[in-house]
Amino acid sequence: MQENISVTDSYSTGNAAQAMLEKLLQIYDVKTLVAQLNGVGENHWSAAILKRALANDSAWHRLSEKEFAHLQTLLPKPPAHHPHYAFRFIDLFAGIGGIRRGFESIGGQCVFTSEWNKHAVRTYKANHYCDPATHHFNEDIRDITLSHKEGVSDEAAAEHIRQHIPEHDVLLAGFPCQPFSLAGVSKKNSLGRAHGFACDTQGTLFFDVVRIIDARRPAMFVLENVKNLKSHDQGKTFRIIMQTLDELGYDVADAEDNGPDDPKIIDGKHFLPQHRERIVLVGFRRDLNLKADFTLRDISECFPAQRVTLAQLLDPMVEAKYILTPVLWKYLYRYAKKHQARGNGFGYGMVYPNNPQSVTRTLSARYYKDGAEILIDRGWDMATGEKDFDDPLNQQHRPRRLTPRECARLMGFEAPGEAKFRIPVSDTQAYRQFGNSVVVPVFAAVAKLLEPKIKQAVALRQQEAQHGRRSR
């Protein structure tokens, strides 16, 4: 009896260790895992040893209990409410999960994620728990919607979507901004096909979002995009999007409010010291009568009473590599002076941590190139720089760029002074990821506003399911 238990325990341990290592290798490279294992100090590990052990399914033989426990800490933990979730949602064009965090914070369960960028996937999996029993991870959303395959009918595509994407109450998507072309419309009309979203949006990633909404009919959706979506292609892109969502049978909050203070456009500066405007489209399924008086104007109720300052987000000491080189600083300085003389505002964006009202420009995906849009002042004397740019003493105070960790805080992925958000990628990839992401507390606020509506939608779904069981 003792022998049987021992064999079973060893088999279970082996399976668990192998599965854990496979998950970790989706996030971290072998070099990082070797460093983590050697940090425990119980065995000597090398890249060759780990690779050989993985290839032979024998890594668990070498892993000590302490090493196993340490590696487990490198994986994200389930949310506090696991496994008692209030509703289900999916996360499309997920990036590193900025929108997801807000909806998870109100009790939601993510049941499907789609993200094509392999580096973003690593960061996503490092920070977000994905229940293997209920969560599906996809890379190219077109493999689900079949939009890249010719000759697939809408009915066949819808069935394929239903097979691969679980039922959900809320759809989240930060879809890319692309122009819509009407090329091919006359051909489709000549074939007797109705002119609608399948025509106008074909070939764009928004079309994939539309196909999923149409196939799965979630109670609501939250779509995010850059502010310029409204003016993109002389307004045609936004007009087609709104018409399409209406055709699908959804009411978008504040749809008619398109003035200069459009509530659909939310600036991250209300939550964190970064000017970052994004358009947020919140849609409600018309037949469920959920929208009522919902408006994003109420988001002001969620603004923090005291916004954190830029200084609170910064580390007191950073590595020298984040300080601009003399050559780069001279180039940016002269570039700005040249454009100032021409009367335009092109140039770097210096921010001063000593000023509690400082707000940065928008962090972009190109920040890794030179960091010009957000430079942190380190005491550079402008008057001295005008007289003698190369003054040795002043050169010691050249500005610096943000570190990836500081970018995580500026985007709201972690609080001031924290280092909880895992960044398993290079600085270049991290800058791209944060620059492509959203201000997390903005969408936490949107989720909070939607919480009563989501509860209402879940109650309707449960009533419908109960009624269906009774009628059988």
Swiss-Prot record:
It comes from the Bacteria. Residues 87-457 form the SAM-dependent MTase C5-type domain. GO terms for biological process: DNA restriction-modification system; methylation; negative regulation of gene expression via chromosomal CpG island methylation. It is an enzyme of class 2 (transferase). Gene3D superfamilies: 1.10.260.140, 3.90.120.30, Vaccinia Virus protein VP39 (3.40.50.150). Coiled coil: none annotated. Keywords: DNA-binding, Methyltransferase, Restriction system, S-adenosyl-L-methionine, Transferase. One of its GO terms (molecular function) is DNA (cytosine-5-)-methyltransferase activity. It catalyses: a 2'-deoxycytidine in DNA + S-adenosyl-L-methionine = a 5-methyl-2'-deoxycytidine in DNA + S-adenosyl-L-homocysteine + H(+). InterPro entries: C5-Methyltransferase, C5_DNA_meth_AS, C5_MeTfrase, C5_meth_CS, DNA_meth_N, SAM-dependent_MTases_sf. Its EC number is 2.1.1.37. The keyword DNA-binding applies. The active site is at C177. Belongs to the class I-like SAM-binding methyltransferase superfamily. C5-methyltransferase family. This is DNA-cytosine methyltransferase. It comes from Escherichia coli (strain K12).
